[in-house]
Swiss-Prot record:
Belongs to the pantothenate synthetase family. One of its GO terms (biological process) is pantothenate biosynthetic process. The reaction proceeds by a bi uni uni bi ping pong mechanism. Catalyzes the condensation of pantoate with beta-alanine in an ATP-dependent reaction via a pantoyl-adenylate intermediate. This is Pantothenate synthetase. Keywords: ATP-binding, Cytoplasm, Ligase, Nucleotide-binding, Pantothenate biosynthesis. GO terms for cellular component: cytosol. It catalyses: (R)-pantoate + beta-alanine + ATP = (R)-pantothenate + AMP + diphosphate + H(+). It comes from Sulfurihydrogenibium sp. (strain YO3AOP1). (R)-pantoate binds at Q61, Q153.
Length: 280
């Protein structure tokens, strides 16, 4: 496994591998890898000749009062996890390499960036789309793997790829959960034991919502009300930012719940913002 920090060197290497007919799979991450990331890496290993993992905590997708400074970082740990999974290359650029002086070009996916997390994290998806567009141009992947836990992010990237004709196939992979139901996230590290216990109400609420739908309930308000009830019982709940049921393509709220619609939530447990979702 090789670690590459220079974008130009990375791009040259990837282009030469593609010339040799190699199929490149790419897993973009912000590091502090967990089983969710590893499941993406395994998908890539299965479907491609070369697997690249990028590790870059992207400052332009964090708002002024968000957790950029304290976001967990441990490169040596990430590196050894990647080695165990037989990753071929880690792309690990510095901030200066990605955003040199004078940088002023941004990518914005207008409609899909609105609503859900977009309402609470202005500029977030502009930061995500911009860094991912840059990474696509540097890594030149055939296939790229994103977790469905960040459902809105996945939709934003799919739209960007379509609208800007990126020659890449975007693969959305299922949410990976802890045995007790908690969706895996690098931010889970912030939770105390008691807060982690409280956070279980999130997945509990989602599973209950799915059960209601399977029992024939299609009124989104009834389902959302029940979800709020369950989450509100969490001892360390600080705030429910949103509970929405949206169409999985447009991300617009629905009047009647149908199969493949998505229930998405964002919740503060203590000082930690957690998101999760489930498909009906």
């Amino acid at each position: 496994m090789e670690v590459i920090t220079n974008p130009g060197q990375m791009q040259t290497l990837m282009l030469s591998l593609k010339k040799q007919g190699k199929k490149i799979g790419f897993v973009p991450t912000m590091g502090y890898l967990h089983e969710g990331h590893l499941s993406l890496i395994r998908c890539s290993k299965k479907e491609n000749d070369i697997t690249v993992v990028s590790i870059f905590v992207n400052p332009i997708q964090f708002g002024a009062n968000e957790d950029f400074g304290r976001y967990p970082r441990d490169f040596e740990r990430d590196k050894s996890l990647c080695e165990k999974e037989n990753v071929d290359y880690i792309f690990y650029p510095s901030y200066e390499e990605m955003y040199p002086d004078g940088f002023q070009t941004y990518v914005e996916v207008a409609e899909l960036s609105k609503g859900l997390c977009g309402d609470f994290r202005p500029g977030h998806f502009k930061g995500v789309a911009t860094v991912v567009a840059k990474l696509f141009n540097i890594v030149c992947p055939d296939n790229v793997y994103f977790g469905k836990k960040d459902f809105q992010q996945l939709k934003v990237i799919q739209r960007m790829v379509k609208d800007l004709n990126f020659p890449v196939n975007v693969v959305g992979c299922p949410v990976v959960r802890e045995p007790d139901g908690l969706a895996m996230s690098s931010r889970n590290k912030y939770l105390s034991d008691e807060e982690r216990e409280s956070a279980l109400n999130i997945s509990k609420a989602l599973f209950e919502a799915k059960r209601m739908f399977e029992d024939g309930i299609t009124d989104p308000n009834l389902i959302k009300e029940r979800v709020r009830q369950i989450i509100s019982q969490a001892k360390h709940l600080k705030e429910i930012q949103y509970v929405e049921i949206v169409d999985s393509n447009t991300l617009k709220p629905v009047d009647k719940v149908k199969k493949s619609d998505v229930l998405a939530v964002a919740v503060y447990i203590g000082n930690t913002r957690l998101i999760d979702n489930i498909e009906f």
